């Protein structure tokens, strides 16, 4: 039975019922809906709507219902209820009879669903932050194992300056740390309880909403009933956090796809996270990484979709808001899966240290060091930059790396270049010179790893 049937003389069309019903996706809110109902039962008992005995009976029934479905809430999908609120109420009435019909006194599905979604989001934030931490741990461990692994760093997908694979790992650690703190910030703004605001104008009963908020583990009650039932900022923030993080994960995946390719051969991904071709028996495809990269689009789409849904809505609640759920459910599930898969990808990664070192020695990635060498000899940087550019052109024509040029050849471009130039052109020297905080100097990278380990352990 619908919760709103008294006003209507005809049954809803079956097509409309399917179009309108939301149980097939909002069943995920079952535990939150039950917990919110327990809190509401206590709140209306405090103002005399229920007796203590009635409250105890309702709470016991709700707890029993929770225990029945918690192992597998998908069993709810066998039911034909309109939404999760209708389902919980109908099951409660089955257990306690007409007493169950009293529970909704003073409550609207508008403040009820706003509560459910905030409670659900809070749970997801905790899960997602743990997934981020797991990936960070794996990145730090991989970095620690590869502090001596020198590889080319890229700009414009061209070899630019040598870095270490450890430094690359720590770059993504930092991105994920920002993802983690974005969730922490969003979580704080989820800590306001909308229950007790009714449909839009507040409750007709003297509900102690501050106590209700505490009972439901919120910091405070919301301050404006109209805003409370209309607000979906917490969903937008969670989707925005997911989208930014998926950008990071997509770039991480793209780097690994490139590093794994035959053209780079910097590393090999495990058989556990790759697949083959139905036609070409030699293929080993980086499907895990490609799917992470591809799934970013559906998360971005969920954010774009909800922004578009909300942008023209008048206050307060409109049925359009039902469209907030499928996108957020899918986006959060996708984000979590991608975080877990990225962690798995790193577990058995095999870095080819010989190949990465060879690649770092190619492409004149030590040219900047030669420019800095000239600056140290008193040449203005802009002039030094030009001199090195001409030197690189010559080296390319001679098919030699810079370090293979003779002193005589170097002196064609400036007389200050001498035998001491060779020491600064070596790969270890290139890394050692970048000793400012955040640079690729091995001691700085080790320091960053230690700081990260301490942070993750705290």
Swiss-Prot record:
UniProt pathway annotation: Amino-acid biosynthesis; L-arginine biosynthesis; L-arginine from L-ornithine and carbamoyl phosphate: step 3/3
GO annotation, cellular component aspect: cytosol
EC number(s) per entry: 4.3.2.1
Transmembrane segment boundaries: none
SUPFAM superfamilies on file: L-aspartase-like
Family under the similarity heading: Belongs to the lyase 1 family. Argininosuccinate lyase subfamily.
Main location: cytoplasm
Catalyzed reaction equations: 2-(N(omega)-L-arginino)succinate = fumarate + L-arginine
Keywords: Amino-acid biosynthesis, Arginine biosynthesis, Cytoplasm, Lyase
Compartments in which it is found: Cytoplasm
Keyword Lipoprotein part of the UniProt annotation: no
Biological process per Gene Ontology, one example term: L-arginine biosynthetic process
Keyword Cytoplasm assigned: yes
InterPro entries the UniProt entry points to: Arg_succ_lyase_C, Argininosuccinate_lyase, Fumarase/histidase_N, Fumarate_lyase_CS, Fumarate_lyase_fam, Fumarate_lyase_N, L-Aspartase-like
Protein name (record): Argininosuccinate lyase
GO molecular function, one term: argininosuccinate lyase activity
A Pfam family per the record: ASL_C2
């Amino acid at each position: 039975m619908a919760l709103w049937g008294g006003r209507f003389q005809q049954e809803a069309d079956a097509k409309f019922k399917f179009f309108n019903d939301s149980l097939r996706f909002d069943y995920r809110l079952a535990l939150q809906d039950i917990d919110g109902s327990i809190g509401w039962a206590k709140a209306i008992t405090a103002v005399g709507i229920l007796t203590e005995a009635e409250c105890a009976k309702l709470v016991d029934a709700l707890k029993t219902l929770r225990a029945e479905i918690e192992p597998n809430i998908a069993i709810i999908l066998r039911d034909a209820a309109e939404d999760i609120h209708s389902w919980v109420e109908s099951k409660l009435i089955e257990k306690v009879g007409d007493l169950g019909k009293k529970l909704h006194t003073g409550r609207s599905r508008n403040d009820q669903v706003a509560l459910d979604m905030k409670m659900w989001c809070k749970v997801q934030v905790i899960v997602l932050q743990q997934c981020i931490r797991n990936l960070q741990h794996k990145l730090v461990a991989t970095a620690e194992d590869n502090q001596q692994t020198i590889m080319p760093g890229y700009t414009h997908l061209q070899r630019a300056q040598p870095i270490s694979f450890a430094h690359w790992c720590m770059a993504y650690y930092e991105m994920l740390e920002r993802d983690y703190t974005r969730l922490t910030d969003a979580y704080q703004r989820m800590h306001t309880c909308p229950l007790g605001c009714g449909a839009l104008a507040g409750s007709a009963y003297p509900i102690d909403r501050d106590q209700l908020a505490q009972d439901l583990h919120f910091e405070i009650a919301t301050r404006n009933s109209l805003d409370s039932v209309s607000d979906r900022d917490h969903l937008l923030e969670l989707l925005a956090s997911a989208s930014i993080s998926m950008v990071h994960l997509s770039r991480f995946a793209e780097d690994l796809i490139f590093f794994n390719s035959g053209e780079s051969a910097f590393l090999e991904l495990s058989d556990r996270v790759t697949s083959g071709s139905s036609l070409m028996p030699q293929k080993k495809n980086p499907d895990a990484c490609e799917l992470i990269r591809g799934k970013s689009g559906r998360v971005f789409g969920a954010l774009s979709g909800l922004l578009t849904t909300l942008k023209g809505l008048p206050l307060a609640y409109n049925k359009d808001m039902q469209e907030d759920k499928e996108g957020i459910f899918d986006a959060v599930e996708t984000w979590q899966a991608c975080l877990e898969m990225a962690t798995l990808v790193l577990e058995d990664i095999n870095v080819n240290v010989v190949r990465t070192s060879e690649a770092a020695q190619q492409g004149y990635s030590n040219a900047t060091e030669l420019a800095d060498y000239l600056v140290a000899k008193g040449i203005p940087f802009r002039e030094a930059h030009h001199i090195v550019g001409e030197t690189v052109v010559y080296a390319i024509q001679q098919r030699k790396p810079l370090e293979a040029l003779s002193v005589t050849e170097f002196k064609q471009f400036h007389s200050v270049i001498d035998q001491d130039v060779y020491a600064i052109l070596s790969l270890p020297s290139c890394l050692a010179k970048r000793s400012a905080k955040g640079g690729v100097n091995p001691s700085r990278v080790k320091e960053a790893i230690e700081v990260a380990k301490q942070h993750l352990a705290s």
